[in-house]
Amino acid sequence: MNEYQIRLVTGPAVEPVSLSEAKIDLRVDHDDDDTLIAALITAARMEAEGLARRSFVNQTLDLSLTNWPADGCIRLPLPPVASVTSITYYKEDNTSATMSSSDYITVTDVDPAVITLGLNKTWPSDALRPVAPIRVRYVAGYGATAASVPERYRALIRSLVLVRYESRDELTAPQERQLQNIRNALRMDYGW
């Protein structure tokens, strides 16, 4: 089995829901809670991405692998994938090399996106260092703007923000059920 780790390199430049949108939902017409609401938006986006196992607004990720895949396919978590920036590997002597993009094919119209070898190509045969020897850097997300995120996800994030804002002091039983329904809706998309 090929173990992997995912690391955020560059986070999204914007959130899927703006502060002004959230304030309208919350019926807040003052600026006193702006910092809190902005933090709730970020937390809601991160929770939603984790539950849906998707990236909403473009962000750069590093996928670290322990070895080359036996089946010839590298599956990229947290779709959708916009592009693969590079595949870098570290040899036994800790020097790095980058695969030529002509050696592999990135298939982004499937979930999860897949990297496969090009025709008559093979994974590098160099001996690899023992820890995190392979790094795939890629951009994942629906696009660079909040408008590119499907409305379904934006609505669920807005709902998370609303419940969290209203339950700052204490979470009631109806609010807990509402949170669970939102979480279940986000988990429904996870099918890969």
Label for each model-derived stretch:
Residues M1-W192:
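Divalent metal-cofactor coordination and adjacent catalytic microenvironments
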